[in-house]
Amino acid sequence: MVINLLKYALVFVVSVLLQVLIFNNVLIARMISPFFYILFIVLLPFDTPRAMLLFLSFSLGLTVDIFTNTPGVNASACLLTGFIRPGVLQLISSRETLESVTAPRVGNMGFQWFAGYVTFLVLIHHLFLFFIEAFTFQGFPFTLLRVILSSVLSVVLIVLSQFIIFRK
């Protein structure tokens, strides 16, 4: 139990540090920004209590907001991501699968399942984040393009992290 807690605390800290120190400084073609820190929400165990999931999601976003001076933008996007995560899991997984496997990993669930799961969560996060950031539907096509391209980059980075960190 303590080892798992330390492992997830490390994932929290490392994902925030990577986001704040590296990925926030990556802007491709003035529109594509990776949001790697969502990895923490993605990797939480299936049996994480809903209140804890929401608290951790909000804390993750708030921590990034503090470092990037974006009051509430990341916190609200992460809170929404944490809120919809249980529904997404129920939508794409059977009850037996969620009870027999402890956490979402490529090794546990398979590449196709994991990529679909990550894509769904990242798209929701990015849609909310970029439209809150724009705070208007003016320039809707440009914002939607940013959502799609940034989502692709974020999903690729998150899935690649599985092969780098959890290789056997």
What are these language model-derived features?
Residues 1-168:
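Terminal, non-globular segments
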